[in-house]
């Protein structure tokens, strides 16, 4: 397809080809995209969770652009949020906002969550962890390849 666009500038998300610009490499775009993704993820929960977000038990895996914003939105709605991340900094940040924290070893026992979000772009859920979730748990995978 790109061969037919000689002399044209092509914007794309993810990838590097001659004559193209990857908008995902623009930090301003990536930050705003994370906000929109988090808002969309919140909408999904509000429309598919069979209860209010208020006092729902929510696990947010990953505390990058999307995870940070999403956790804040969920906390603002009164959800009981647990953030799963690996760095000491993200743990401190999550706890400071009022969320709980677990590391990835905590995924072996996914607990009694009403809602689970994955934003980690690596495979973190095995068949065992997925089978340990309650049948009514809503799982929203927001991760990019190869984790999503």
Question: Each predicted region: which residue ranges?
Answer:
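Glycine/serine-rich phosphate-binding loop and adjoining beta1-alpha1 elements at the start
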Residues: 1-55
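NAD(P)-binding Rossmann-fold cofactor-contacting core
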Residues: 77-97
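Short, polar loop motifs at secondary-structure junctions
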Residues: 12-19, 85-90, 144-147
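Rossmann-like adenosine-cofactor binding region
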Residues: 2-4, 94-148
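Glycine-rich adenosine-cofactor-binding loop
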Residues: 52-75
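Active-site rim beta-loop-alpha module in soluble metabolic enzymes
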Residues: 73, 85-86, 90, 117-124
């Amino acid at each position: 397809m790109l061969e037919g666009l000689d002399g044209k500038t092509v914007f794309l998300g993810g990838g590097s080809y001659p004559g193209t610009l990857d908008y995902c490499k623009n930090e301003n775009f990536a930050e705003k995209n994370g906000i929109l993704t988090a808002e969309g993820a919140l909408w999904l929960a509000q429309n598919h969770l069979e209860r209010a977000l208020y006092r729902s038990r929510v696990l947010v895996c990953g505390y990058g652009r999307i995870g940070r914003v999403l956790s804040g939105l969920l906390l603002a709605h009164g959800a009981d949020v647990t953030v799963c991340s690996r760095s000491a900094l993200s743990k401190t940040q999550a706890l400071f906002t009022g969320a709980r924290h677990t590391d990835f070893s905590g995924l072996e026992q996914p607990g009694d969550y009403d809602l689970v979000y994955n934003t980690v772009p690596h495979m973190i859920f095995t068949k065992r962890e997925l089978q340990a979730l309650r049948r009514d748990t809503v799982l929203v995978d927001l991760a990019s390849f190869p984790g999503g």
